[in-house]
């Protein structure tokens, strides 16, 4: 489900509820037209998971690659729409990936580094996606770490995403993910479930392109 972390135990009721995905985006959601400006994006993908950081998964980290794959798919769809209208494009020219434990200082340290806050005059990523640690487990502290890093909160963004996702899977409403701005970087918390990641990004990516445009270009 959308808010279920990959670390969640499989012996509880919530973990046994199958993820329901009837389409790539909820029927009630209509993506806004892409911004009419060329965008070249630097993306950070941060997996927050004790077990992934310890290398305990036989398959390796799944949620981080799910973020990258969904981003690539969504950007392709949006660029198809853009080229048909005005010829502008949004390109991902750099992707950084990392895995940290569910520890506030580790999460904060990586976020601040990617925001360019660890060097004088350093430029950061355009968007950072975290995946994992947004649920109700005592170790789910990604939103708390994010709030200690961001300078301006954009809580309405993830509230909207959660509401749209809940129209497909009601348990998506249990996600505590937030979003905000640190310098010129937008940070957004995604769930740790790979399917939930895709569902959220179907909604989030079209909105974030406008957010980046406003933040970087006014």
Where is each model-derived feature located?
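Non-catalytic beta/alpha edge segments that cap or flank active sites
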Residues: 1-218
């Amino acid at each position: 489900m959308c808010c279920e972390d990959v670390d969640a135990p499989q012996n509880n009721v919530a973990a046994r509820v199958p993820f329901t995905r009837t389409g790539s985006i909820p029927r009630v959601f209509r993506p806004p037209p892409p911004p009419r400006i060329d965008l070249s994006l630097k993306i950070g993908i941060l997996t927050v998971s004790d077990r992934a950081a310890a290398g305990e998964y036989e398959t390796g980290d799944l949620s981080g690659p799910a973020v990258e794959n969904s981003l690539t798919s969504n950007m392709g769809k949006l660029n198809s729409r853009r080229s048909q209208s005005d010829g502008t494009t949004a390109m991902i020219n750099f992707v950084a990936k990392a895995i940290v434990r569910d520890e506030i200082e580790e999460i904060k340290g990586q976020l601040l580094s990617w925001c360019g806050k660890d060097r004088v005059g350093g430029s950061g990523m355009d968007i950072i996606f975290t995946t994992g640690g947004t649920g109700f487990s005592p170790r789910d502290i990604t939103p708390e770490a994010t709030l200690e890093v961001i300078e301006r909160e954009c809580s309405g963004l993830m509230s909207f995403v959660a509401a749209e996702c809940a129209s497909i899977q009601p348990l998506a409403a249990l996600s505590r993910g937030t979003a905000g701005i640190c310098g010129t970087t937008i940070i957004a918390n995604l769930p740790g479930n790979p399917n939930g990641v895709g569902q959220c990004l179907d909604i989030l990516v079209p909105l974030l392109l406008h957010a980046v445009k406003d933040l970087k270009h006014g």
